[in-house]
Amino acid sequence: MAQNFTKLNPQFENIIFEHDDNQMILNFGPQHPSSHGQLRLILELEGEKIIKATPEIGYLHRGCEKLGENMTYNEYMPTTDRLDYTSSTSNNYAYAYAVETLLNLEIPRRAQVIRTILLELNRMISHIFFISVHALDVGAMSVFLYAFKTREYGLDLMEDYCGARLTHNAIRIGGVPLDLPPNWLEGLKKFLGEMRECKKLIQGLLDKNRIWRMRLENVGVVTPKMAQSWGMSGIMLRGTGIAYDIRKEEPYELYKELDFDVPVGNYGDSYDRYCLYMLEIDESIRIIEQLIPMYAKTDTPIMAQNPHYISAPKEDIMTQNYALMQHFVLVAQGMRPPIGEVYAPTESPKGELGFFIHSEGEPYPHRLKIRAPSFYHIGALSDILVGQYLADAVTVIGSTNAVFGEVDR
């Protein structure tokens, strides 16, 4: 028997794309290379100035939240890699942190050290990727080439640790899957030196570059009031002068023990945001240099010990009958967290990334909601772009550092 489906009309089907001599409506993206394949903007122009901007999203929607409600808690971890795929370790950690808060797990100190190192390494890789792609959007191609070369060294380190370069899956609920490989920290120290040199090179190319500054200064200005009303976070918020960083406000892992600063901007424009990304690379280097000596002082366990939720070490599974049975139950049926709900915020490279989980005591979350920073920053384009020139739209979009894997989810 044939089924009848309701036909949905496109949202902008009846728009007349040309007005009078002074005004017109322009369709920007999703095919435009600077929309990164998934953003569509309906821009109303008066001359070359934007008087209205309407973002349309959803081209990368995959139902990630619903997938999480139909997978066991451990099964869902690799899916989080596909949210912000330029900083997948941050996604892994944010999800694991929410589940661990729900389970009230105590994470071994060595696992905390490794996690914090990976998070800051991941932050540097993400920031240098943003700077390279943003420079390419504006026309500074040489920066893209230098930055990508340095980024490769960081990806090599991630590959040495977890076997993957992009979708890392490097965090587990309760700890980390592996200890650091031999000589990995020596490679990390070399990478920090490479990052410092690359940063100096990029600053030499851009900071006093007249064209770069003209394209970014006083372009895409965000006021503190606008940032708060749109729920912005991360560098989009700190660029307005508001010093809010979840690593300081609600510290997790070892951030409470670490000495680092939260750089803020003065004007809230695209150039301020570029400067903050560069300054945050310095802070990540500073954090990792404090963590490296901490690693040697820690004991060997890298996973929490709780037989109700976490499998025993592999050696015990291979030699002890009870550990094998417990492992079988956790893999075949999944863990059953207590009834309750939790929201756990983290500071990802883009801003506040948090997972809300509502548990009914089943192996699957009853409700899983992802609070992704890029979603709010793309929505704010309807305010930020008004009054900008059409030629500056690409600069403004790029300076939000939005990734559509976490916008559409």
From Swiss-Prot:
SUPFAM superfamilies linked: HydB/Nqo4-like
Any one annotated GO CC term: plasma membrane
Its membrane topology: Peripheral membrane protein
Localization: Cell inner membrane
Keywords annotated in UniProt: Cell inner membrane, Cell membrane, Membrane, NAD, Quinone, Translocase, Transport, Ubiquinone
Domain of life of the source: Bacteria
Residue runs in coiled coils: none
GO-annotated molecular function: NAD binding; NADH:ubiquinone reductase (non-electrogenic) activity; quinone binding
Intrachain S-S bonds: none
Subunit structure: NDH-1 is composed of 14 different subunits. Subunits NuoB, C, D, E, F, and G constitute the peripheral sector of the complex.
Annotated family: Belongs to the complex I 49 kDa subunit family.
The protein, known as: NADH-quinone oxidoreductase subunit D
Organism for this UniProt entry: Helicobacter pylori (strain G27)
Primary gene name: nuoD
